[in-house]
Amino acid sequence: MARPALRISFLQACLLGALGLVLARAAQLQLFQGEQWARKAERQRTTRDTLEARRGSIYDRRGTPLAVTQEFYHVGVAPNEVQDRREVVRRVARALRVPAGELERRMRAERYVYYHGPFTATDIEPLRKLKGVHTEGSYRRSYPTQSIAAPVVGRLDADSGSGGSGLERALDDLLTGRPGEAVFIRDRRGRRLESPARRIREPVPGNDAWLTIDFTLQDIAERALEGALRDLDAEGGDIVVLDPRSGEVLAIASRQATGVGARPTAFTDPFEPGSTAKLFTAAALLRLGRVDSTAAVSGHCGKLVVATSARATRTITDTHKECGDLTLSEAITVSSNVAMAQFSQQLTVTEQFTALRDFGFGSPTGVEFPSESRGALKPPEQWQATYTRASAAMGYEFGVTALQLASAYGAIANDGVLLAPTLVREVRAHDGRLLYRHQPEPVRRVVSSRVAATLMRYLRQVVSTEGTARGAQLANYEVAGKTGTARRFVDGRYQGYTASFAALFPADDPQLVIVVKINNPTKGSYYGGATAAPLTKQMLERMLAARNTTLDLRRLQEAEPVPLAIPEVRPPDAVARVSRVAWPYRDRDTTAAE
């Protein structure tokens, strides 16, 4: 009897000991390691992930959306949380436009029924208060204006989602928000359920940017350029519209006749500006006092031989065969290469180089755009003393972008002060707080007010019956400007032409600088006066007719109308003189030589 009782007591003691150990372990886990094990369990059934932040939007100067981030939603249903299954099935199926039977079957078979959108806020509004129905927001980028201003605005990188080109890339840090963080629940297999259990940190949306671009002017510029490339059978071109009083870029268009998409060549591709650069040599001559209004050189009947070395020469020619003397003003008006080559010899190499550099050539403008070209301006020690000075005076042996050329002409229109061009007018936080507003940024004074006024007189004369830009004349407003025609340097040799025109409008108080550049027009004339100048006139007429542009029409209306100048003619020279008037419907082959 004693032995069985002893065994029972021993077993009871063992059981009590084991129970004690279990209780002790439980107490240890609960009291001393409970928090640690709870965290481990939490990690096993949950995961942390980032919450996407809304990317800031891009607008034109008047609030027209150019790039916006649209929120869309995904929807999930947790069957074990649903209280009224029939009602949930009915309302979810209707809102998401899915078969009710399919939803019912999935709710019986799956722990979490997930519908990947995109669904709009309107779609999910009826579901927001349903028990067991969860929504998850996400974002996608859209461009409401389609192709208009597309190279400027840019696009996102398809892989990273960050800015890939254009202003999307240049302003990426401003537009990108700060991601949030949330805890998501995992199922038994470790798969993440798409409904967040809780948010740890809310995402902060990115900033919004208002550009200097005027959507209406941009549309006019792009349509005009597209039509010109078609009508002139040209390879490509650029148009820049700039406010000379602020440096704000109002429109900037680039097109190529071949290839996919449009490259922003107005920022990236330098070209030899041709006769549009004659104004900068004139500016240096006037600023340094090397010429006055009476100083003149011979036109040499349109042909001048210039030494390029001790044994070599080159011949400079003019389309206009002027045999008499030409003043600086007249040389600009008729765009005489021969006269400007002679005038340039009154400047030293360093003086001419400095003049071009001061107008911004050879350096990036600093505009908010990736991969902007600095152009090409070789240092003075690489200039050939005589011929390079003559070449530079004619717009050769250095390269400029269309934006640089517009900025330089803007300095003349702005009383001689060069301003830094900009594409960004304003930046605001997601809650509307103003973070940045552009103010005109002077770079340097390039010429005095007096010299700037003199140059403006020269440019007004170019757009007259005596000048090379007769095709840019408007009926009621005066336009100032300078034409350009230059051989194109392609693949190591000169082939084809670049036609250009730099305009200031209105001439008495410029509100706009317009630079038009056409690459290798092959149908009709290739001269800037016969291609780019009439295109500028066409654009100005459309801008004046448009509503809601940056043009101050009240100021224009207060100005005294300027009629087209029709010269007095006499029978002996009637045909020659009348053919030089800028008739609205000129024959395409009637060109202005320059």
Predicted regions, residues:
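Short, gly/Ser/Thr-rich active-site loops of penicillin-recognizing serine hydrolases
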Residues: 433-440, 530-592
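Short, small/polar residue-rich loop motifs at catalytic or cofactor-binding pockets
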Residues: 50-54, 179, 233-237, 421
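Conserved, well-ordered alpha-helix/loop/beta-strand core segments that scaffold catalytic motifs
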Residues: 193-237
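Short beta->alpha transition motifs characteristic of CBS
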Residues: 53, 68-74, 251-257
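Beta-lactam-recognizing serine transpeptidase/beta-lactamase-like catalytic domain environment
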Residues: 187-200, 237-275, 280-521, 528, ...
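Small/polar-residue-rich segments within soluble enzyme cores
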Residues: 31-32, 77, 81, 87-98, ...
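Hydrophobic alpha-helical transmembrane signal-anchor segments
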Residues: 2-36
